[in-house]
Every structure is written in structure tokens, then in C-alpha cells.
């Protein structure tokens, strides 16, 4: 007796050997993952766990992090350079740390320190107030006395050669000198204010505000022409001179600013809000090469700069890039084009800007600026911003900080539920990976390594592994629904994984069937000594229409390929 020959159900194999990172969108390609932890693109095209992190320092009250040939951080009210405490005393609270030449500048404290000479530090602002007699006299711009002169609306009757006369006939006083035949205007006439200690801490060229002078015309904003400890020279000519005992104050002030950046040997800043009872919506620049002076206006190309803006809303971030400076609001950017002649230009561009609270997310990666906006992460190369965060799905992030490292955009942010995420975007391949929920408040790149400072005070080497390296790394990768990519009925009969775990590293494979929440363990591998070829893990799920695969483990591991073998089912519903 003969039985009919049975025909095996046709099978189809799909193999993935290029893993596409995190993609939360429905119907994402096989090889991408709906969720993951502690993976990165360093092993692409394979799926690889991130390198172990090292804790290089522990802070008590972290407030800021930057690199100046070595890591620099703020802990409480102290500034540390490469672990050494400096003598600079700061206030409590978050800081903006901006580099300019050898100097590190700290906002909102308006303090500075020379990182090549840690004994040179202080305040960028300065103020003196007299306590004794103040003498006002006319002088040359260098401070040389002019001598005696007559004052009046008519010239002296019998002047001698070299006699001086202050002509007050036309309202504005003019000092003239008699050359033997006619009266000629004397140029370079200034006013000197002399009192003990009035000029201490100032330099020629400083833009200062003088207050309290009884002499008309001396109060106001001036650029100092010459300075000594006991006198200052300002470029005005007063009608009357003399002395007073009332206090005179001289102040070199810096405007309050929301964000500060350095570009072209200047500092640039912005401010939106109420200052001294007046609404302010302005962009500022320091004097060229001088971070202390923001009010030096002498008609030179090196002058300070200030400009009001018409766009509404608070400033949300700033970045120096593409040869200029960009100040962001949520719905626009103010692009500053610096000029060597001092004729700086600002253009308002209506486009997605930096989300409020995400000013620290603006970071350059290989010449492209990335930042977190209201609707995702954007890349700006000089034309218009483009959203690159579609694979992250509908999740919106806030309280974001970021840095660029090795062609990658590292982002630490918080979702609407308050959960923290460390996400890494490989800009060359367009791949996202999620690492963990470390509460990182600042990044910096130093010595080729990327550092992150957590709100708990841990200074982490995220890539180099220096310091106290963590013993093991727990990781996880979870696929979307497998088996929904074709309209006909198919059944996933076998999964095959080519993996290479390190010695004593563990990998487990679990599946969830038909959209369920229960996870069933199907296989496990533990790395062995001397294993170089890797392992092949065979998984045989029960018959189902669709399933999700979750890989999880401890220790470093690399997944080279994933194969899914499907068996064709009936054509019925």
C-alpha cells in the first residue's frame, strides 16, 4: 500500500546583517528596534553594546562642565580645573561656561579665570566710588594738563601767543589757542577727574558710566582715554571745572544676558525681558578681543555692539557656527553675520528654533548644527533646519543637553513622563540608538573622550573608560512585530542569531506572541574563554501569526545577523 507523497510547506528566509538602530514607527524595517538600552552604532553594521563607562570624579553640587585642555567643572561655589580647586568663588546655581582665548568666562556671575595662570581671576565688571575730594580739569587725551585759560563769549582783548580761550558764544564750548594772529581750535581736549583710587581697576579704552559729577556734561557713558590709579580721562570738554566732595562712581558694566557664545574673538550675547523697568529684546557683542567691555563705543571697527530685535518671544539658545552666531527663539533664529569693519548684520529667519529649556542641546557635528526643537531634533547646515528624529516616534523631549563627538550627536533629554534618555544619533548613517536613563546635565569633549556630568554629581567618561570603570553593562533590544511585512499568511518557524559574546557575558532571547505582554524565554548563550568565531543561537517559537523578539544580556556582546524562517500558510483570512 502506498501513501501519497506530502509536499513540504514552502519556506522563506529573511536575513538581516545590517542593524538599523532605534525606530519606533509602526512597520519599521526588520533589523530596527522599537526599544533598546545600552547599545550604540560603534559596531555598525553589527549590533553592539556600548563600551563601559568610567567615573572620573564625584561632585557634591554640580553646576557646569567644560573642557580647557582638561575637564573643568563647577562644584557648589568652587571652580575646579583638572581636579584642582581654584581660588575663584562663584554663586550657587547653574553656569554657562564660555571659552575665549586663554580665559574661561562664567555666567551669570560675570567672572573670569585665566586657565593658563590660575592665579589670575576676578570679575569682568568693575566699580569705584570716591570718598574724598574730586578735582575736575581740562587736559589732553593722555592726561597732560592744559594750563590756565579764559572763558567767555568774546575773545580776550590782548592775547599772547599760546594763550587759551574757551569760546562759549555758540552754546557748545570750544577751546581755542592764539597763534599770534588768529584763534585756532584746539583738538584732543578731554576732561580729567582726579581723586584717590578713582582709576584703580580700569584701563584706557574701557567703556564706563560716570555718575555723581556736579560738573555738567561729565555724567554718562564714556570711553576712557587714559587712566591712572588716581585719575581718569574722558573725551568730553566741560564748560566749568573745579572740585567737589560728593562721591563720584565709575562703573564698567556688562549687560545681563540669557545666552553667550564666542565668535571671531568677540563674545556675543542676547537678552529678552525687563531690565531696570524697561523691556529689552537685544543682541550684544563685546569689544574685539576684550571680554570685559560691552559699552565701548568710539566709532571704531573694534567697538562693542548692541542691536534691538523685532521678533517676539524669549531667546531659547545660542550657537557659534558657520562663521557667525545664531540666537534662537522657538519659532525663529536671529543669524548674526559679523563684519571685520564693524558693520555687523542680523537676519531673522522664520523656522523651527530651539525649544524653551533646551538651549544646551545645540551642538555642532562635522559642521552641521543639531538642536532640539518643539517637534523633534533638527539639523541645520546653513539653509533651513531639517527634522531628523522621525525614528523616535511621537515622543517629544525637553530639558535637553547635547554634544558632538566622533560624527555622533549625543543627546540627554527628558520625555513628557519625566523619564530621562541618553540618545545617540549617528549623523553619517542616520541611525538612532538609546543608551540608558542617566540624568546627564552637561557634556564636554576633552582629549578625544566624551564626558558627561550627571545631576547626581558623577563625572562620567562615556567613551574612553578612564576612571573607575563599571563592572558590567546590562543591555536590551526589542523588535517590533515580526510577521506583518506581507499580506499573505505566514508563520515564523525559526529564528537564528549569529552572536559573539565576550567571556562570561550572557545573552537571553525572549519572545512575545501575537501582541501579548507575556515574555517567554527561548534560548540563552554564555560567552566562553577563547571564543573567536561567535555562536549560532537557534530559536523555535510556537506557531503564531506574529511575534516580538527581545534580546537582553549582561556584558559586552555583538550580534552579527538575525535570520527569520517563515512558512507559508493558507490563503484564507
Per-segment meaning from a language model:
Residues 51-58, 253-404, 433-434:
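Beta-propeller and closely related beta-pinwheel folds
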Residues 61-62, 68, 76, 81-101:
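Blade-loop segments of beta-propeller domains
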Residues 5-9, 124-126, 130, 171-172, ...:
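Small/polar beta-strand repeat architecture
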Residues 85-93, 134-164, 185-194, 397-400:
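Extracellular/surface-exposed low-complexity repeats and stalk/linker segments enriched in Gly/Pro
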Residues 78-81, 110-126, 163-188, 223, ...:
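Short, surface-exposed terminal/edge motifs of secreted or surface/virion proteins that either
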Residues 83, 179-181, 338-341, 382-383, ...:
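Short loop/turn segments that connect beta-strands within beta-propeller blades
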Residues 70-73, 102-106, 156-176, 205-210, ...:
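Short hydrophobic/aromatic-rich beta-strand motifs
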Residues 2-69, 353-357, 364-368, 375, ...:
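Beta-sheet repeat architectures centered on beta-propellers
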Amino acid at each position: 500500500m502506498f501513501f501519497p507523497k506530502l509536499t513540504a510547506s514552502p519556506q522563506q528566509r529573511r536575513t538581516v546583517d545590517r542593524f538599523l538602530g532605534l525606530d519606533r514607527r509602526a512597520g519599521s524595517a526588520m533589523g530596527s528596534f522599537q526599544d533598546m538600552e545600552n547599545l550604540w552604532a560603534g559596531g555598525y553594521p553589527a549590533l553592539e553594546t556600548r563600551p563601559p563607562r568610567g567615573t572620573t570624579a564625584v561632585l557634591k553640587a554640580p553646576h557646569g562642565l567644560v573642557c580647557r585642555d582638561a575637564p573643568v567643572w563647577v562644584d557648589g561655589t568652587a571652580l575646579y580645573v583638572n581636579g584642582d580647586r581654584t581660588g575663584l568663588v562663584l554663586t550657587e546655581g547653574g553656569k554657562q561656561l564660555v571659552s575665549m582665548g586663554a580665559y574661561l568666562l562664567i555666567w551669570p556671575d560675570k567672572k573670569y579665570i585665566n586657565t593658563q595662570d590660575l592665579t589670575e581671576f576676578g570679575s569682568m565688571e568693575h566699580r569705584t566710588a570716591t570718598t574724598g575730594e574730586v578735582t575736575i580739569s581740562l587736559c589732553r587725551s593722555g592726561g597732560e594738563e592744559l594750563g590756565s585759560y579764559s572763558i567767555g563769549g568774546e575773545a580776550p582783548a590782548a592775547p599772547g601767543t599760546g594763550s587759551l580761550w574757551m569760546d562759549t558764544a555758540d552754546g557748545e564750548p570750544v577751546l581755542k589757542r592764539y597763534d599770534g594772529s588768529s584763534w585756532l581750535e584746539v583738538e584732543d581736549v578731554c576732561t580729567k577727574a582726579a581723586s584717590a583710587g578713582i582709576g584703580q581697576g580700569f584701563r584706557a579704552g574701557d567703556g564706563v558710566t560716570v555718575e555723581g559729577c556736579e560738573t555738567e556734561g561729565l555724567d554718562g557713558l564714556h570711553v576712557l582715554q587714559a587712566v591712572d590709579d588716581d585719575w581718569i580721562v574722558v573725551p568730553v570738554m566741560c564748560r566749568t571745572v573745579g572740585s567737589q566732595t560728593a562721591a563720584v562712581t565709575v562703573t564698567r558694566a556688562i549687560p545681563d544676558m540669557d545666552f553667550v557664545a564666542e565668535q571671531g574673538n568677540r563674545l556675543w550675547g542676547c537678552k529678552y525681558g525687563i531690565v531696570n523697568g524697561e523691556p529689552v529684546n537685544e543682541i550684544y557683542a563685546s569689544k574685539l578681543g576684550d571680554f570685559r567691555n560691552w559699552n565701548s563705543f568710539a566709532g571704531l571697527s573694534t567697538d562693542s555692539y548692541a542691536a534691538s530685535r523685532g521678533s517676539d518671544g524669549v531667546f531659547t539658545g545660542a550657537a557659534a557656527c558657520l562663521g557667525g552666531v545664531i540666537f534662537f527663539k522657538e519659532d525663529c533664529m536671529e543669524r548674526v553675520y559679523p563684519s571685520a569693519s564693524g558693520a555687523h548684520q542680523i537676519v531673522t529667519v522664520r523656522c523651527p528654533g530651539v525649544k524653551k529649556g533646551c538651549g544646551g542641546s545645540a551642538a555642532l557635528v562635522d559642521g552641521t548644527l543639531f538642536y532640539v526643537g518643539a517637534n523633534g531634533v533638527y539639523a541645520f547646515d546653513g539653509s533651513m533646519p531639517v527634522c531628523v528624529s522621525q525614528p523616535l516616534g511621537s515622543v517629544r523631549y525637553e530639558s535637553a543637553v547635547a554634544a558632538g563627538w566622533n560624527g555622533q550627536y549625543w543627546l540627554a533629554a527628558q520625555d513628557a513622563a519625566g523619564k530621562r534618555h541618553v540618545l545617540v544619533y549617528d549623523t553619517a548613517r542616520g541611525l538612532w540608538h538609546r543608551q540608558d536613563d542617566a540624568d546627564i546635565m552637561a557634556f564636554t569633549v576633552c582629549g578625544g573622550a566624551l564626558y558627561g556630568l550627571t545631576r547626581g554629581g558623577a563625572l562620567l567618561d562615556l567613551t574612553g573608560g578612564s576612571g573607575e570603570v563599571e563592572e558590567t553593562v546590562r543591555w536590551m533590544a526589542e523588535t517590533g512585530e515580526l510577521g506583518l511585512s506581507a499580506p499573505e499568511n505566514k508563520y515564523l518557524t525559526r529564528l537564528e542569531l549569529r552572536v559573539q559574546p565576550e567571556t562570561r557575558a550572557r545573552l537571553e532571547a525572549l519572545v512575545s506572541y501575537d501582541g501579548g505582554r507575556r515574555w517567554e524565554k527561548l534560548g540563552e548563550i554564555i560567552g566562553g574563554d577563547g571564543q573567536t568565531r561567535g555562536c549560532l543561537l537557534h530559536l523555535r517559537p510556537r506557531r503564531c501569526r506574529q511575534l516580538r523578539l527581545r534580546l537582553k544580556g549582561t556584558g559586552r556582546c555583538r550580534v552579527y545577523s538575525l535570520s527569520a524562517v517563515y512558512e507559508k500558510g493558507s490563503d484564507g483570512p
